[in-house]
């Protein structure tokens, strides 16, 4: 079964590289295409994937914030939050194009 997955990933990447003259160029990889690329890049060592979970409790019972509270909080912490937020593989390779070297960062 694993051989078929690797063969499928190889065929996919060959098809993508034949369309794109520069196969080493960063590409958008989403969903099954991203998983196939990780299988191909990481090989037998495999890769790790830790999907984000929604751990916030339901907040429907809390009153909504006023416009001033929201504006001040967003303005005060916007830059800091963007700096400390770690980019996941979806943000790095699906929302933006990534290279094979960036994919290797997710191998075990």
Curated annotation (Swiss-Prot):
One Pfam family hit: Insulin
Role summary: Insulin decreases blood glucose concentration. It increases cell permeability to monosaccharides, amino acids and fatty acids. It accelerates glycolysis, the pentose phosphate cycle, and glycogen synthesis in liver.
Name of protein: Insulin
Annotated disulfide bonds: 30-94, 42-107, 93-98
InterPro entries: Insulin, Insulin-like, Insulin-like_sf, Insulin_CS, Insulin_family
Propeptide: 54-85
Gene symbol of the encoding locus: ins
Keywords, in A-Z order: Carbohydrate metabolism, Cleavage on pair of basic residues, Disulfide bond, Glucose metabolism, Hormone, Secreted, Signal
Self-association and partners: Heterodimer of a B chain and an A chain linked by two disulfide bonds.
CDD domains, sorted: IlGF_insulin_like (cd04367)
GO MF term list: hormone activity
Entry keyword Secreted: yes
Chief place where the protein resides: secreted
Keyword match Disulfide bond: yes
Cell compartments where the protein resides: Secreted
Region forming the signal peptide: 1-21
Protein family membership: Belongs to the insulin family.
Source species taxonomy: Eukaryota, Metazoa, Chordata, Craniata, Vertebrata
One GO cellular component term: extracellular space
GO terms, biological process: glucose metabolic process
Organism in which the protein naturally occurs: Cyprinus carpio (Common carp)
